[in-house]
Amino acid sequence: MALENLLHPTNIKIDEYAKNATKFSFEALERGVGYTLGFALKQTMLYSIAGACVTSIKINDGKVTSLEDVIPCDETVADIILNVKSLSVTLAEDVETGTITFELSGSEEEIFSEEAKLSEGLAITEEVFICSYNGGKKLKIEAKVEKGVGFRPAQDNFKDGEFLLDATFSPVVFCDFEIKDARVGRRTDLDKLELNIKTNGNVNCEEALRLAATKIQNQLRNIVDIEEINKGIFVEDPKDINPILLKHVEELNLTARSSNCLKAVNIRLIGELVQKTENELLKAPNFGKKSLTEIKDKLSELGLSLGTLIENWPQDL
């Protein structure tokens, strides 16, 4: 069968059935292609998308050395570790590690993640309950945050005063797929791919899918002989793009808060920014309506707007 005669999915559905959870369906695909794409996308999302997470925890400057130690709160040491580990975090593009610190003293109170002291470039994207502090004795909890890709098992349980944790860096917390039968005309030997994705909120499901597809595409570029199937490939040429879109977002002269929000979600170029919708930006850590209004005004001065589709945008800039 000639390459140009292969079916491509024309019926694409997106069902955001819960917060940070979306089901995508693609039909119709040639028999076997559904499984090939589904498996590749699943593995890439779970193990090849970069992110940040808590990798170690120190309590009372390393004086708490066992899960059985008594601390001044209703929760056990193990409970504290699990609660802090569950934090969804991001690090700015130019920051590799960060620290989350809780210093508790005084009267009893319930402690949530919003009360943490954060190192520069670090953000917590969702509120999480940490502990019920009983008051009296001081309690200090320090968590180290690192960037990484995929899964990294802890080499030890406890070392140098720190509880070491298995690290799951990918913002995709669940991904699975199912292949169903599809039909086009008289052909019934086709695939329908249903892809179910859940994220921790640091990226939305559509962005996670786009990142995975782009990574696979870039890997295949090194394998495919361009000359042989040139008719079926569109090669993006930066010369065909408005040069303003290739400029860095710093040239918009945004406030520090807005700039840091864009860095946190890895938006570097104006062209990357204009392809985002208002809703996508508002989901970014610490991004509010003031930042949104500022960005819209700056783009308007250049004759640009959010939600713009750039068909020939290069994926490898």
Swiss-Prot record:
GO molecular function, one term: DNA-directed RNA polymerase activity
Transferase recorded as keyword: yes
E.C. numbers: 2.7.7.6
InterPro entries hit by this protein: DNA-dir_RNA_pol_insert, DNA-dir_RNA_pol_RpoA/D/Rpb3, DNA-dir_RpoA, RBP11-like, RNAP_asu_C, RNApol_insert_sf
Presence of keyword Iron-sulfur: no
Annotated signal peptide: none
Stretches assigned to coiled coil: none
Region (Alpha N-terminal domain (alpha-NTD)): 1-227
SUPFAM superfamilies referenced in this protein's UniProt entry, alphabetically: C-terminal domain of RNA polymerase alpha subunit, Insert subdomain of RNA polymerase alpha subunit, RBP11-like subunits of RNA polymerase
GO biological process: DNA-templated transcription
Listed GO CC annotations: cytoplasm; DNA-directed RNA polymerase complex
Positions of region (Alpha C-terminal domain (alpha-CTD)): 241-317
Top-tier EC class: transferase
UniProt catalytic activity: RNA(n) + a ribonucleoside 5'-triphosphate = RNA(n+1) + diphosphate
Keywords: DNA-directed RNA polymerase, Nucleotidyltransferase, Transcription, Transferase
Function comment: DNA-dependent RNA polymerase catalyzes the transcription of DNA into RNA using the four ribonucleoside triphosphates as substrates.
Family: Belongs to the RNA polymerase alpha chain family.
Domain remarks: The N-terminal domain is essential for RNAP assembly and basal transcription, whereas the C-terminal domain is involved in interaction with transcriptional regulators and with upstream promoter elements.
Quaternary state and interactors: Homodimer. The RNAP catalytic core consists of 2 alpha, 1 beta, 1 beta' and 1 omega subunit. When a sigma factor is associated with the core the holoenzyme is formed, which can initiate transcription.
Protein name as annotated: DNA-directed RNA polymerase subunit alpha 2
